[in-house]
Amino acid sequence: RCVCRRGVC
């Protein structure tokens, strides 16, 4: 799955 974290998806 795609999760946006620390500016990265």
Swiss-Prot record:
Positions bearing the Cyclopeptide (Cys-Arg) (interchain with R-1 in subunit A) cross-link: C9
Signal peptide start and end residues: none
Keyword list, A-Z: Antibiotic, Antimicrobial, Defensin, Disulfide bond, Fungicide
Crosslink (Cyclopeptide (Arg-Cys) (interchain with C-9 in subunit A)) position: R1
Disulfide feature: C4-C9
One Gene Ontology biological process: killing of cells of another organism
Record note on modification: Forms a cyclic peptide with subunit A (PhTD-1). An additional intersubunit disulfide bond is formed.
Top-rank taxon, per record: Eukaryota
Sequence similarity: Belongs to the alpha-defensin family. Theta subfamily.
Quaternary structure and partners: PhTD-1 is a cyclic heterodimer composed of subunits A and B; disulfide-linked.
Function: PhTD-1 has antimicrobial activity. In low salt conditions PhTD-1 has antibacterial activity against the Gram-negative bacterium E.coli ML35p (MIC=1.5 uM), the Gram-positive bacteria L.monocytogenes EGD (MIC=1.6 uM) and methicillin-resistant S.aureus ATCC 33591 (MIC=2.5 uM), and the fungus C.albicans 820 (MIC=1.6 uM). At high physiological salt concentrations the antimicrobial activity of PhTD-1 decreases slightly: E.coli ML35p (MIC=2.0 uM), L.monocytogenes EGD (MIC=1.7 uM), S.aureus ATCC 33591 (MIC=3.6 uM), and C.albicans 820 (MIC=6.5 uM).
Protein name (record): Theta defensin subunit B
Species annotation: Papio hamadryas
